[in-house]
Structures are given as C-alpha cells and as structure tokens.
Amino acid sequence: MSKGPAVGIDLGTTYSCVGVFQHGKVEIIANDQGNRTTPSYVAFTDSERLIGDAAKNQVAMNPCNTVFDAKRLIGRRFDDGVVQSDMKHWPFEVINDSTRPKLQVEYKGETKSFYPEEISSMVLVKMKEIAEAYLGKTVNNAVVTVPAYFNDSQRQATKDAGTISGLNVLRIINEPTAAAIAYGLDKKVGAERNVLIFDLGGGTFDVSILTIEDGIFEVKSTAGDTHLGGEDFDNRMVNHFIAEFKRKYKKDISDNKRAVRRLRTACERAKRTLSSSTQASIEIDSLYEGIDFYTSITRARFEELNADLFRGTLDPVEKSLRDAKMDKAQVHDIVLVGGSTRIPKIQKLLQDFFNGKELNKSINPDEAVAYGAAVQAAILSGDKSENVQDLLLLDVTPLSLGIETAGGVMTVLIKRNTTIPTKQTQTFTTYSDNQPGVLIQVYEGERAMTKDNNLLGKFELTGIPPAPRGVPQIEVTFDIDANGIMNVSAADKSTGKENKITITNDKGRLSKEDIERMVQEAEKYKCEDDVQRDKVSSKNSLESYAFNMKSTVEDEKLQGKISDEDKTKILEKCNEVIGWLDKNQTAEKEEYEHHQKELEKVCNPIITKLYQGAGGMPGGMPEGMAGGFPGAGGAAPGGGGSSGPTIEEVD
C-alpha cells in the first residue's frame, strides 16, 4: 500500500476516535461496524483476541478477560492510590510486577500478563487499521492526545504505546488543546478570545481555559477530576437498580458479575436515551435466577441520583478561572467536549453558571478531540492548505516543576501553566563547607515543601572542589520539549562538570528492550489474529459449500436430471461433512481445506455430468442452479465462497 497521511487519534479511557485531514477538511473515520468511536476494550478468549466493539459486545460472557480502562493504569505505579482504588471496581486481574501494574488474563488456555502500554497499543493498532481501511493506504504517523492532567510519565508511556503499535507519534497533545484547535478552525477568530473547554468524557473530566488570538492558542489553566465521567453516572444508576431489585425480589445481584454487567449495559443505553427523552425503560430477560427485570427511570430521577456529581463539575470550572486570573464574564466561548456533555442538566448548570451564556455544541462532542488532533497531524506533517497554515499551538505544563533546597523547600524553576517548549536556568550553591557533591531532586507540584509534592527523579553532581559554603556555583537547567518531556541538568561552573537526567518519572518507564520486545509481540499477536481469520474463512467456505451443494441436489427442478444414486452420494457426503463441522469448530485451516477437497471429489464429477446432460448449453440449465452452486469446476479450496465478503452471524 502507498503511504497515507498522518492521522489524529483521541485515545480515550472508554472510547477512542480517529480522524484525518484531507481535501481541506477533517474526516472522522467510522470503524467496520459503522461507529465513529470505538470502545477502548481488548478481550482475550480461548481462540482469539478481540479489540473494540467486538470486545465490548462479549464482555458479559467474558468479564475477567476483557480489559478496559488501561488509560487509568498507564504510566502509574502499582502502589499508586488511584490504581489501588480502581482495582476494586475492575472485573479483571491487576498484578504487581516489580512495582508496575500488569493486566492478567487467560488467553488461548494460558495465563498471560500485559503492561497497560501494550493494551493501549492494541487499541492504537485498531485505530490505525480503521484509518488504513478507509484511506486504502498505510498509516505511519499520528498525533495522539492525553488529558491535560497527565504527568510526564503518563505522557511518555502513551508515546511508548504508540511505538509498540507501529506508529510514529509526531506529538502528544493535550485533549482540550486539540478541541480548541478543532474549534479554532471552525471559527477563525481575529481578536483575542478566551475559551473555556469543558470536557466530560466516559472516564475523565477536564476543564481548560485557552486564549486564541490570530490563530495562536495559549493554554492559561487546566483543572479537573481524573475520575469523573459517564461511567460514574452509569454506576449510580446501576446501584439504584440493584437496590430496586433487592426491594422487589429480596435478592442481591451485586456479586453476580454477569448480571451486573448486563444491567450496566442497559443503564448506559438508558442514560443516552435520557439525553433526548424524559423517560427510559429497561427490560432485561432473566437477569438473575430466572427473574425478568422490567423497570423504567425518569430524567428527573437520573438527575437526582447524580445531583452531587453534576453540581461538582462546576468546582474545576471555578478553579480554572481562578488560575487563569479571569472572571467568568471574561470568557467569550464555552466549548463542550465528551459524550457526557450531552446530558441536559449538565448543560443547564454550566449555562446558568455563566449567566445564561450560549454554549458551543457545533462540534460533535465525541469527535472534537480527534478532529483537532487530525488538524495538528496535518500541520506537523507539513500540510500546505491555507486552512491550517496559520495555526500555532502552545501547550503548558500542568504542574509547577522545581528542585528541593535546604530544609526540604520546593524551589520552583518552571511555574505551572508555563507555555512549553520552555527552558529555565537558576544558579544554586552548597549548603556546607567543603561539600563534595549535591543531590538534585526534581519535584512536580504546588506545595511549599517537597514532601507534599511528587518526586519525579533525582541525580547527583559529584566532584565539586573543596570550598566554603556558598562559594561553588551550580547551574541547574530545566528543559521541556514540545511533547512535555523534560531534561534536567546540573553543571559546576568552576570545573564545567555536568550531570543530567531525562525525567521519565521512574514510574516504571519501559526500557528500550521492553519496547522492542512488545513491538515484536504485537506483530506476533497480529499474525495470530490473521491465522484465526483465515481459519474462520476456510471453515465458512466449507460450510457454505456443503449446505449449498445439499440444497442444489435437493432442488425439485433437478428431479430426473440427477440419478437417485448420485443424489444420495452427495447428500451422504454433505451430511458427513456437516456433522464433522459441528464437532470441529476449532480445527486447523488445512483440515477444512482437506474436507472441502474430499467433498469436491464426490460432487464435481456428478455436477459436471449434469452440465453435459444439459446439452452443454447454459440455456438448458435449470434456473436457480448456478446461484445455488458454490465454486463450480472444483474451485480451489477456499474458493467456495471466501472470495466474496463472508458474513457470519454473531450468536
């Protein structure tokens, strides 16, 4: 395939989305199911690996081996409080592999474990394939988005996931920044405008304030809650119905994973309905111990169940305004991003907070981030169209960065919300006489003392010549690149001796070797998936050949044209093959092909005789014959129907 354009990928906690900028506009690409967003789910079964819709659709049957929310684990340590509290809610197993979380599943009868980066990379592979199928070209370059909140290690890990998936990640950009780009293109603003981006997705909530002037974006502040989103609203509804079930039937379904999962799916559907109707009904057959659960919920009740969560979305709005030193009257535009912003109550709360100001919903909230990422991808890969030429992107650091100085004080070198890329240098000195070295400890956070902030990494600068305290001059430099990845160096001015560290947040960055290995494994899994696909295709081919052959010889139009003996011969062989198929759903491709050859050996001579008996003239053929006849003339194995699109019903 020829090389395709760069794409923009919104790698979401619950759903992902991919877009491409071509012919002067952005196109959001639908997947093979026709959906413009794809669940960030990966499932492992005893025969195959599923990604996206296919994975989410079978989650009720296979909850322990269906992995989602990898974004909540990526770039974090196992003992991180977030990881520990999230684990309680997941049906799948998370294990501790030398301080790093891994997801453990049963795959093809073996226990396998994967890093969050690997799971995210599988979702990225899926998004890459969706784009390739649409463009008919290979896609190598992508811009991938992350929450504004992500720290360095999470950004780095997301980049690694891209590498494992075979993508060259042109840049990691903040989701709100991407939404702002989408918005900036839509609106072409001249004078300076302050824009508030309210992004409430399936799993995270981010509020950001940006200024846009002459096509230049600057992020003024970011706030939010990494743990609020559509799923939380679903959970409230699920708990409400579990309680209702208990009241009605005196039975507790909460320990039955499958029942809860089916209830959750119904609740998610009901929630979506409630954005456009005031009431939604829920009907689940045989939910628990044979009891059918038929009930309904009103929009008012749904709002009441989530009242505190909905109201709470305004706190980060106030915080981001404070950080940006802005009054709410100064906000020109409010942009809604994320599927949960379709909830009428949330729109109303936000609109009331801004004294009745109109909200911008012109961009589909699920797609705005991928839209902006696609534009950014076009810019970075040198798209010459005037729509994108005059757009410049400035991103910011979400937290202040600094080092520890005497007494455990946090000395900030780069203030939070500083536009990146950026570089800051400050001179420090020794604390005691003849001190031979200094320990440079790098922190991120807003507190005055380092013990309350987050340690990113540390290194020593040794070999300082003996001197009284306060004499040596040690120059510390913080340098952050456009991807938000930071280098910290310290140099002794007298000797020129230098040491540095790239902050990769020792939260368990993957080593080069790890990434290499994972890239190879990803290839291996892809090959296994392909083998599985071929296998299914041979099986379907054999099955359709046998059934078609059977219906062909049973067709009454052939009465008298085929001897009973031949007919019996074909039917017996077809039934034998169909019987074998029923017992061997997971045989090898070669076995299916072998059986097809055997079947063709019996059928072809008889069918050929039929043709000749019809005077060799197509006109003499019984109607319907050709249609019901798979791969005439001993079609090569696999030719019996696998050449066209093979559709199998999902049971």
Curated annotation (Swiss-Prot):
It comes from the Eukaryota. The keyword tRNA-binding does not apply. Gene3D superfamilies: 1.20.1270.10, 3.30.30.30, 3.30.420.40, Actin, Chain A, domain 4, Substrate Binding Domain Of DNAk, Chain A, domain 1. One of its GO terms (cellular component) is membrane. The keyword DNA repair does not apply. Transmembrane segments: none annotated. GO terms for molecular function: ATP binding; ATP-dependent protein folding chaperone. Keywords: ATP-binding, Nucleotide-binding, Stress response. GO terms for biological process: response to arsenite ion; response to cadmium ion; response to copper ion; response to heat. Residues 623-651 are annotated as: Disordered. Pfam families: HSP70. Residues 623-643 have a biased composition (Gly residues). NCBIfam families: PRK00290.1. Belongs to the heat shock protein 70 family. This is Heat shock cognate 70 kDa protein. The gene is hsc71.
